[in-house]
Amino acid sequence: MIWHVQNENFILDSTRIFMKAFHLLLFDGSLIFPECILIFGLILLLMIDSSSDQKDIPWLYFIPSTSLVMSITALLFRWREEPMISFSGNFQTNNFNEIFQFLILLCSTLCIPLSVEYIECTEMAITEFLLFVLTATLGGMFLCGANDFITIFVAPECFSLCSYLLSGYTKKDVRSNEATMKYLLMGGASSSILVHGFSWLYGSSGGEIELQEIVNGLINTQMYNSPGISIALIFITVGIGFKLSPAPSHQWTPDVYEGVRFVREIPTSLSISEMFGFFKTPWTCRREISPTPVVAFLSVTSKVAASASATRIFDIPFYFSSNGWHLLLEILAILSMILGNLIAITQTSMKRMLAYSSIGQIGYVIIGIIVGDSNDGYASMITYMLFYISMNLGTFACIVLFGLRTGTDNIRDYAGLYTKDPFLALSLALCLLSLGGLPPLAGFFGKLYLFWCGWQAGLYFLVLIGLLTSVVSIYYYLKIIKLLMTGRNQEITPHVRNYRRSPLRSNNSIELSMIVCVIASTIPGISMNPIIAIAQDSLF
């Protein structure tokens, strides 16, 4: 009898929960329509994979690509709609959040073509790779619109778990496993620190979890200037810092960038046609081919999602502690710009060089976060983030292509690449120059707008540090470009000497992404006004 009553209560509770969830989806589901498209793509991928006897179907790439493009289209149609809070205050929809969601979708859309040839070469499982990418994208999108502590914690964990799985995808490789373990341990520690900071805010505000309600709670409890808020600020800054990877929270970045790799069998002394699979040979040597598209994906999406979350957390709950978080972020920006660019000079691996370069780049982005809504700080940050996506992914596309064709990512092995593949060498040079901020490329105008906004806000010291470190970054980028263009015959390594020249017209999906990113890294800088206007229009 007791079991009967308990069973009936369980059924009633389950039905009530289901009806409430259905009610939320029915009335609030349209506000997360772009996310629903990705969820549908995930379900479709799983259904096809479970129902098909043939594994690793090549056209599976079409499903996530179509889902991402449709999600971008849905976001564009929703532009300039009134801000809405849905799902009982857990999720907020406005132009500011949507532009970050657009950037994340753009990153994922460009990263999928990078992975096609890579997965074919490594013979890795297609479905799982695409599932992880789509799920991470979904987590990043929910993080951009998160309006309470629970969503702010769960959404990045969704992204982070997929990132851990992607970084450890080549489980037979020792260095990949080592990098994944470091990434996992530091990620878990940072999440714990972040939650601890949330708990201080939760207690100080009288038990509120929504961002705006926390501000009201702090006013009611008169705790907005208490020591507990300072403790919460420190812990939350450390937790978010891991996602953004500024110095000194950057230790995982170079190791993960270099550790994510794969090993491919390449013949030692055969013709180019034999090396690329036209003939079989029984004797081969093992060479590293890197970096992977996983690194390209992690290098941009995590920073975009974390930047969106950081702006909302610092701007709303810590409204009364603006001087405190400004000081903390200024320290992080200075350390990132100086350490990132100085250490990048000494690197011999392209992956580690780009890792330290990204640490320096996030220092520039932090300037926009500090400036904030006033003086177009957020608009300059969004503009520079858009250019950074194209510059960084374009550079990674070039390096992925070079790695697939040569089996190396050592900087000295790029010597004389222009003599073998002018198209690839010029593309890499343009992306590196844009990252350095040389005119008239997009990176120059992005940095100019960012530094100008910082100068207008009175951040003179930060802007001067940014200018000096930009000159340092130009030095090590030009050093690589000089190697590409002027490598002497005796300096050309066997990797480039045996390089297979790529045709100007190619169906290679990596080259397609590379061309798109190179164009986006050069042309938009000439016509900045429309981009700036869109960024300014998105401010909340």
UniProtKB/Swiss-Prot annotation:
It is found in: Plastid, Chloroplast thylakoid membrane. It is a multi-pass membrane protein. It catalyses: a plastoquinone + NADH + (n+1) H(+)(in) = a plastoquinol + NAD(+) + n H(+)(out); a plastoquinone + NADPH + (n+1) H(+)(in) = a plastoquinol + NADP(+) + n H(+)(out). Its main location: plastid. The keyword Transmembrane applies. InterPro entries: NADH-Q_OxRdtase_suN/2, ND/Mrp_TM, Ndh2_N. GO terms for cellular component: chloroplast thylakoid membrane. Keywords: Chloroplast, Membrane, NAD, NADP, Plastid, Plastoquinone, Quinone, Thylakoid, Translocase, Transmembrane, Transmembrane helix, Transport. One of its GO terms (biological process) is photosynthesis, light reaction. Pfam families: Ndh2_N, Proton_antipo_M. The chain crosses the membrane at residues 24-44, 57-77, 99-119, 124-144, 149-169, 183-203, 227-247, 325-345, 353-373, 384-404, 425-445, 448-468, 514-534. Its EC number is 7.1.1.-. It is an enzyme of class 7 (translocase). It comes from the Eukaryota. One of its GO terms (molecular function) is quinone binding. Belongs to the complex I subunit 2 family. NDH is composed of at least 16 different subunits, 5 of which are encoded in the nucleus. NDH shuttles electrons from NAD(P)H:plastoquinone, via FMN and iron-sulfur (Fe-S) centers, to quinones in the photosynthetic chain and possibly in a chloroplast respiratory chain. The immediate electron acceptor for the enzyme in this species is believed to be plastoquinone. Couples the redox reaction to proton translocation, and thus conserves the redox energy in a proton gradient. HAMAP family: NDH1_NuoN_1. This is NAD(P)H-quinone oxidoreductase subunit 2 B, chloroplastic. It comes from Coffea arabica. The gene is ndhB2.
